[in-house]
A protein has these predicted regions:
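Mid-domain beta-loop-alpha active-site segment that forms a flexible
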Residues: 133-140, 168-200, 267, 287
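A short helix->loop->beta-strand "cap" motif at the edges of active sites that frequently abuts
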Residues: 64, 99-101, 126-129, 222-223
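Beta-loop-alpha module in the N-terminal Rossmann-like domain of NAD(P)-dependent dehydrogenases
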Residues: 62-120
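A contiguous active-site-proximal alpha/beta segment in oxidoreductase catalytic domains
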Residues: 110-168
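Contiguous beta-strand/loop segments that form the cofactor/metal-binding neighborhood of enzyme cores
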Residues: 2, 190-255, 269-277
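C-terminal helix-rich "cap/oligomerization" subdomain common to oxidoreductases
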Residues: 1-13, 72, 79-82, 128, ...
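N-terminal Rossmann-like dinucleotide-binding module
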Residues: 1-62
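Hydrophobic residues in well-ordered beta-strands that form the structural core
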Residues: 28, 68, 105-106, 130-132
Length: 300
């Protein structure tokens, strides 16, 4: 898989952040390990996974050690990146926070509101930096869309996130097949609607998360939005689209022409900057808990 290692235009002047990686599955291999090893803002300090042979394989590809235990991984790093199912992340992230490690977290924080709250509470209690891998948020096209949306009066919105990854392949994993598109794709779309329209105050759902689920959201500003989610439909490529409507011209965000490889250098730089300066981005565990509350209220 091609992977952009292009660094942002300004030089990195801090020591690289030593990041330990938890997980050695498809997403750990395809994104986390490559991104963290590319630097210059980060180095891959070690890899730990439930299967030692898988951790060793991922670590060896980047000249990093494979840790024999989670505790050993914590000893080698100053930040931890998670590329594991939500239930595993929710069990381990509070331990990393208690050890004073910064957290690069996947969405959703946990499989339910209780476990997600435990992660967010640990981050707050131990005052560690946290950042959520809401991939699309780190793409320049997304940021341009959100900046323009902030200038608009929005009456209503329609959106979708659709693909067929649950049908077969590496990403048809047990937790995705069990919980479906609501927990896997829902955080991305709810985050975009919550940011582009106005904070979401209520969500109603209909359908089956493992097949197709429809969400109707009410926002603080009185706007109403709808979101269609499915990971079980046959499409030539993933489709993410948000349409904003109001008194002015419609505003459309569509990922059809964006290269997600552009996200990784930005994500890496912003996480490392947050760790080195102690100033988070706002796309953090607290925001993840807000999204998890919306997911919980949308459970059909």
């Amino acid at each position: 898989m091609p992977h952009s290692t292009a660094a942002p235009a300004t030089a990195w002047t801090h020591p690289p952040v030593r990041v330990g990686l938890v997980g050695a599955g498809p997403w750990a291999r395809a994104m986390h390990a490559r991104m963290l090893a590319a630097g210059p803002e980060t180095t891959l300090a070690g890899v730990w996974a439930r299967r030692p042979e898988a951790a060793a394989e991922v670590a060896a590809a980047y000249g990093a050690p494979a840790a024999a235990s989670f505790e050993e991984l914590l000893d080698t790093c100053e930040a931890v990146a998670f590329a594991v199912p939500p239930a595993v992340q929710a069990a381990l992230a509070p331990r990393a926070a208690a050890a004073g490690r910064a957290l690069l977290l996947e969405k959703p924080l946990g499989t339910d509101l209780e476990t997600a709250r435990a992660v967010a509470d640990a981050v707050a209690e131990h005052q560690v930096i946290s950042q959520l891998v809401l991939t699309k948020r780190y793409h320049p096209a997304t940021r341009a869309f959100l900046a323009e949306a902030a200038t608009r009066e929005v009456t209503g919105a329609r959106s979708c996130y659709l693909h067929g990854a649950f049908l077969e392949g590496d990403f048809a994993t047990a937790w995705r097949l069990e919980h479906g598109a609501l927990l896997d794709l829902g955080p991305h779309l709810l985050d975009l609607l919550d940011t582009a329209v106005a904070p979401i105050v209520s969500v109603r759902a209909t359908g089956d998360p493992t097949r197709w689920i429809e969400l109707t959201c009410e926002h603080e500003n009185g706007a109403v939005s709808q979101a269609s989610l499915s990971g079980s439909v046959n499409l030539p490529r993933a489709r993410t689209r948000v349409e904003l409507f109001g008194p002015g011209e419609e505003l459309v965000y569509d990922t059809a022409d964006i290269d997600h490889e552009e996200c990784w250098p930005i994500l890496r730089r912003e996480f490392a900057t947050a760790v080195r300066t102690g100033q988070g981005t706002g796309i953090d565990a607290a925001h993840g808990l807000h999204i998890q509350r919306l997911l919980a209220s949308a459970r059909p």
